[in-house]
Amino acid sequence: MVEQKGNILMKRYEIGKLLGQGSFAKVYHGRNIKNSQSVAIKVIDKEKILKCELMDQIRREISVMNLVRHPCIVQLYEVMATKTKIYFILEYVKGGELFNKVRRGRLKEEVARKYFQQLISAIDFCHSRGVYHRDLKPENLLLDENRNLKISDFGLSALAECKRQDGLLHTTCGTPAYVAPEVINRKGYDGAKADVWACGVILYVLLAGYLPFQDKNVINMYKKICKAEFKWPSWFSSDIRKLLRRILDPNPATRISVSEIMEDPWFRVGLNSDLLNKTIPTDKVDKVVHVDMDSTFGNLSNNINEGKQEAENLTSLNAFDIISLSSGFDLSAMFEDENSKEESKFTSTNTATTITKKLEDVAKNLRLKFLKKNGGLLKMEGSKPGRKGVMSINAEIFQITPDFHLVEFTKINGDTLEYQKVKQEMRPALKDIVWAWQGEQPQPQSLNEQS
């Protein structure tokens, strides 16, 4: 169905005016026909999220919103689906974004503290359930009719089960100005500590009316973030400065935790004791939404070709990932030591299938074992041990757009000189699929010129 004002969705909800839209979804005001309750209806296009490999992200968003049912978090009431659309029926928060309030000027200290207390309470609740938001910013903080805070947009959230064996998260997420130094570093990071950093940036913004880390040059901004280089507004009290110093600590190991923030004297002024409870009264939240994932998402994979099926397994890059992976913007050199693994990258206008086939052919010609892994990860291994064991190279394909990919080589094991030799032999053999090696000028070819 085409969503228009006055349409009835599955005989249960009346669709009202359009509230907002993005690349993959539109959000409408809605009304529950049975009880006249106002709701927000998020309409997601199945085909678009399938093409951009966001199906798992949508599934995760449903799972996360069921885990974090808290008065300061936007509630998910129901999930419905047709053959082409997925519908999230959400709590309607009519007070607008906290960002719009800050845009008119900085907040009074007691008002900023109230919102910060509610934010920390909700984040503490999320973390206690193994959920990390990873995209906290004023634009994702809404206000209800009573001017209470509601966290929204769990699309980038990570579950504790998404951690690797080292107990850390490894996917770069978030909005650059609010991202923690260790996330920019592109090493593993603690999701809880990264959320704490973002909360600190938000508190600064609420009290100052502007960001702590600003620069027209994004690289300079990242350097400031990594060094926690910012200035104190004259109106910041000593108690606020003391707390923010501990939150905006560039070292996650010594950065203050959520539980420590909740014990801070400035934080506890006028604190509502209900916010300290991880167990929320059942009358303040709605029941858990039970979703049949198979019927909601359907078997869409049968409707796509082999090339798209392969693309579904790739890692998708958001804008921050692309900046981080780009040679001109990669700040990892600021942190890595001489013993870090060697990497090289190239971009390609070919499909993932074509890139994989070419890499397999080149590996065979160089007498390397070739193995396909999940998530667009390919592995090449030498046939016999060298000075430092068997050389092992990972080649990972990232999708930037459906027609544009980034391939990253990483030496996992073996002798560096042997790796450099193999890499030099691979470069001319890969020329047919390489648009540009990172750090070099691209070939004079537009993305539209590919055959």
Swiss-Prot record:
<dbReference type="Pfam" id="PF00069">
    <property type="entry name" value="Pkinase"/>
</dbReference>
<feature type="region of interest" description="Activation loop">
    <location>
        <begin position="153"/>
        <end position="182"/>
    </location>
</feature>
<dbReference type="Pfam" id="PF03822">
    <property type="entry name" value="NAF"/>
</dbReference>
<keyword id="KW-0547">Nucleotide-binding</keyword>
<dbReference type="InterPro" id="IPR011009">
    <property type="entry name" value="Kinase-like_dom_sf"/>
</dbReference>
<keyword id="KW-0067">ATP-binding</keyword>
<dbReference type="GO" id="GO:0004674">
    <property type="term" value="F:protein serine/threonine kinase activity"/>
</dbReference>
<dbReference type="GO" id="GO:0007165">
    <property type="term" value="P:signal transduction"/>
</dbReference>
<keyword id="KW-0464">Manganese</keyword>
<dbReference type="InterPro" id="IPR008271">
    <property type="entry name" value="Ser/Thr_kinase_AS"/>
</dbReference>
<dbReference type="GO" id="GO:0106310">
    <property type="term" value="F:protein serine kinase activity"/>
</dbReference>
<comment type="similarity">
    <text>Belongs to the protein kinase superfamily. CAMK Ser/Thr protein kinase family. SNF1 subfamily.</text>
</comment>
<dbReference type="InterPro" id="IPR018451">
    <property type="entry name" value="NAF/FISL_domain"/>
</dbReference>
<feature type="active site" description="Proton acceptor">
    <location>
        <position position="135"/>
    </location>
</feature>
<feature type="binding site">
    <location>
        <position position="42"/>
    </location>
    <ligand>
        <name>ATP</name>
    </ligand>
</feature>
<dbReference type="GO" id="GO:0005524">
    <property type="term" value="F:ATP binding"/>
</dbReference>
<keyword id="KW-0418">Kinase</keyword>
<dbReference type="InterPro" id="IPR004041">
    <property type="entry name" value="NAF_dom"/>
</dbReference>
<protein>
    <recommendedName>
        <fullName>CBL-interacting protein kinase 10</fullName>
        <ecNumber>2.7.11.1</ecNumber>
    </recommendedName>
</protein>
<feature type="domain" description="Protein kinase">
    <location>
        <begin position="13"/>
        <end position="267"/>
    </location>
</feature>
<feature type="region of interest" description="PPI">
    <location>
        <begin position="341"/>
        <end position="370"/>
    </location>
</feature>
<keyword id="KW-0723">Serine/threonine-protein kinase</keyword>
<dbReference type="InterPro" id="IPR000719">
    <property type="entry name" value="Prot_kinase_dom"/>
</dbReference>
<feature type="binding site">
    <location>
        <begin position="19"/>
        <end position="27"/>
    </location>
    <ligand>
        <name>ATP</name>
    </ligand>
</feature>
<feature type="domain" description="NAF">
    <location>
        <begin position="304"/>
        <end position="336"/>
    </location>
</feature>
<comment type="function">
    <text>CIPK serine-threonine protein kinases interact with CBL proteins. Binding of a CBL protein to the regulatory NAF domain of CIPK protein lead to the activation of the kinase in a calcium-dependent manner.</text>
</comment>
<dbReference type="InterPro" id="IPR017441">
    <property type="entry name" value="Protein_kinase_ATP_BS"/>
</dbReference>
<keyword id="KW-0808">Transferase</keyword>
